[in-house]
Amino acid sequence: KILLLDVYPKSPYRISKDQNGAYGTANNYGTGFVSKLLQRLVKSSIDFPSLFTVQVCGELKYQGHDVKFSKELDLNENFDLYILPSSIVCHETEIKHIKLLVKNKKNVIIIGPFVTSNPQSYLDAGAKIIKGEPEMFFHNPINKIIDFEKLPSIIENFQNYSLDELYFPGWETIFENYIPKMKFLGNGPTININ
């Protein structure tokens, strides 16, 4: 049982991990009345997960894993593995959650461009990291994530696949507990395309 845990700090403005090369952006427009109004409008109107997280979800589901997606950590629900997408804009919040998970003897892997170029604080917090495109690692069934203790702290140098070889993204799992939105395009659910 695997949880894709996409954590964010509490903020009055929108934070997205899927922009700026997946390092993320924070839309803090200032302290004036119009700025605060715009911040609230954007925060309530646009929200979606990072595409690499959705693709990893699809790879894991295709291989038969029980995968869940959440933006909230519930330690009462037990998972064999916690996978967190990394970002520069949520770095401190991610580290806090990693330390909490490791303290509770949970297995943690961090994915994404930010951890690829800035791994040390994640390693120091007790997580294992994937350097590079995480969907490429998870696509290969030879990579046994269930044998977590046998994985190196830094997972890298794995085979790359063409996009046509990858499985479909795991949007159905994402939609179980979370609805991505882009209200400027309508009130229904939205799938982002970068």
Identify the residue ranges that each predicted region occupies.
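Acidic, low-complexity intrinsically disordered segments
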Residues: K1-N194
